[in-house]
A protein has these predicted regions:
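Short, ordered loop/turn segments at secondary-structure junctions
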Residues: 65-66, 88-91, 150-153
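Glycine-rich oxoanion-binding loops at beta->alpha junctions
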Residues: 86-122
Length: 183
């Protein structure tokens, strides 16, 4: 390869890299997942997580519906945060009232993969089987999972560490998610 050709290829690489560099610094995208029929205690936790995410400049991703999703969205929206709801139905109006940006999928629970793939970290607050599927997807994709009163996993090998970072408060959940993103 001639030096002229090498210089041209190097220039193309630089241009391509520059083309994919965001103009603005993107806010971290953190998903909050959890059950639709949650206890008051879990709903308070979820609302606190949403509030903490907004205060720290993160975008909250959620399923956009009721329960933990709505509580987290409410907490985030009430302090001016951005809430993106990945809605399982094909209608934007199905999203809860606190969702800033509804993304309609018409995919039912299949939208769980979109929530997880779009997140840099996942905070699970409580959870039913849908939450369990999202946790499993995140772990398989090596996306950090922070657990606030959520599923506990058991393996045959007791020396293997828990793949979920366990916390007991909303602030600790957001701290752990931000740390996982920055590590």
């Amino acid at each position: 390869m001639t030096s002229e050709c090498r210089d041209g290829v190097a220039g193309l690489r630089s241009a391509r890299t520059a083309a994919f560099t965001p103009i603005v610094k993107r806010a971290p995208q953190i998903a909050v997942i959890g059950e639709r029929h949650a206890s008051r205690s879990l709903l308070r936790d979820a609302e606190d997580v949403g509030r903490e995410l907004a205060r720290r400049g993160a975008v909250l991703l959620c399923g956009g519906m009721s329960g933990v999703m709505e509580a987290a969205a409410r907490g985030c929206a009430e302090v001016g945060g951005l809430v993106v709801g990945i809605v399982p139905t094909a209608e934007a109006q199905d999203a809860n009232d606190y969702v800033s940006v509804p993304i309609v999928t018409g995919m039912g629970e299949g939208r769980n993969i979109i929530i997880v793939r779009s997140a840099q970290a996942v905070i699970a607050v409580g959870g039913s089987y849908g939450t369990l599927s999202e946790i499993a997807l995140a772990l398989r994709l090596e996306i950090p999972v922070i657990g606030l009163h959520t599923w506990v996993f058991s393996r045959e090998r007791p020396d293997e560490r828990d793949p979920v970072v366990r916390v007991t408060t909303a602030a600790a959940a957001v701290d752990a998610a931000r740390k996982a993103i920055n590590d």
